[in-house]
Each structure stands twice: as C-alpha cells, then as structure tokens.
C-alpha cells in the first residue's frame, strides 16, 4: 500500500517539476505543444495496454477463468472505468482550451480553477493506475507504470503551466497550480488501494478499470487537444514515440 502511494506522489510531483520553465518563459508554440501532448497520450495508451489490460487478462486466467469468461470480466472492467470517467466528466464543471466550458454548473467560476479541475480528470486515472499496479504480484509492474507516468507528467506540467499563464495567472501561481493538478494522483492511488483492500480477487478488475478510465481520457480529451492548431502530424508522431516509450519501459522492467 505504502509503495503505491509514495510512487504516485513522486509521479504527481513530476508535474510540478515540468512546470518550472514557466518561471522564465511564458510561450511554447502550438507546433511544439502538439508532439508534446501526443507523447504523453502515446505513453498513456501504451501503459494502458501493456501495464494494465494485459496483466488484468493474465490475472483473470490465473483465477481459473478462460476464453469468453475471462474476456468478459476484463471487458467489463474497462467499460466500467470509462463509464466512471464519463459520469465524472459530465457532472464536474471544467474548462478546456479547445472546447471551452463543460460539465454541470460553474459557469461563473474562475477560468484557472476550471482548467485545474479539467486536469484532475486526466490525473486521477493515472494515480489510480499506479496504486492498483503496485498491488500486483509482480513488483516491476508498479515500477513500470509509475516511471512511465512520471516521465510523461514532466512535459504535461509545462503545457498546463503555459495554459494557465495564457489565462492570466502569474508565473509562480501557474507553476503552483500545475503542481496541484499532479497531487490528484495520490488521491487516485489511495482510491485504488482502498478498493483492493476489500479483496485481492478485485485486482484484475482494478487494473482493467484503471485502463478503461485512461482510455476514455486519451480519446475524449487529450487526442483532440493535441490536434488543435492544425498540427495533427506532429501530434501523431509524438503519440507514436510515447507508445514506443511505454513498450520499452514495460519490456525492460518486466
């Protein structure tokens, strides 16, 4: 339990580390932001596949299920994770650079606060993934997930801080709020750890749930954001490299 929480805290802190350059610059071209966000999403997509869904399938088989029975259990976990994020997305007020205000209420809230709330939608499932993966029998699984998420949190922190600067926040406030978005990850990890404390048999469900939640965020939020400004090719190149990074981490540590 402790290892997962500490790892998620360190991974979340990487967001603040990535935000530090905002103290000396307030601009990053959209062309550069495309591959940056694409890299993050590629790593998420790879991590969702290699470190969450595939281990969930192996664990379900280890519990004596096979064929359609195993597939249905993992599929149900993935769909439940996506549904959880969809409901949260529809209820919580937040704001995106591309799509503007979304969620229920909060239309008069400060735009910086709404943007921070939007990032909690991204970071909660990442923390959940770290917490759940550290409960797996293979200790290297949790390390792979935490390192991958921590690595992609660094450029994400810069993108978040620059967006906050563009909305009018001071450099120090932008860096602090970017760090704050990363602190949602230990909350997600705690959520996963507490759920799994009920029964170890829930582990494959937890891995699949975290994978589904991340998949929802990748498709619904981050890929559209990375394609804004007409730099789809650069964003897709970044996504491919991020996916390869996740593959290398998983195979090197596994």
Curated annotation (Swiss-Prot):
Keyword Cell inner membrane set for record: yes
Membrane topology: Multi-pass membrane protein
Transmembrane segment boundaries: 4-24, 74-94, 112-132, 143-163, 176-196, 198-218, 234-254
Binding of Zn(2+) 1, residues: 126, 152, 156
Superkingdom of origin: Bacteria
Cellular compartments annotated: Cell inner membrane
Keywords: Cell inner membrane, Cell membrane, Membrane, Metal-binding, Transmembrane, Transmembrane helix, Zinc
GO MF annotations, alphabetized: metal ion binding; zinc ion transmembrane transporter activity
Annotated family: Belongs to the ZIP transporter (TC 2.A.5) family.
The protein, known as: Zinc transporter GufA
Organism: Myxococcus xanthus
Lineage: Bacteria, Pseudomonadati, Myxococcota, Myxococcia, Myxococcales
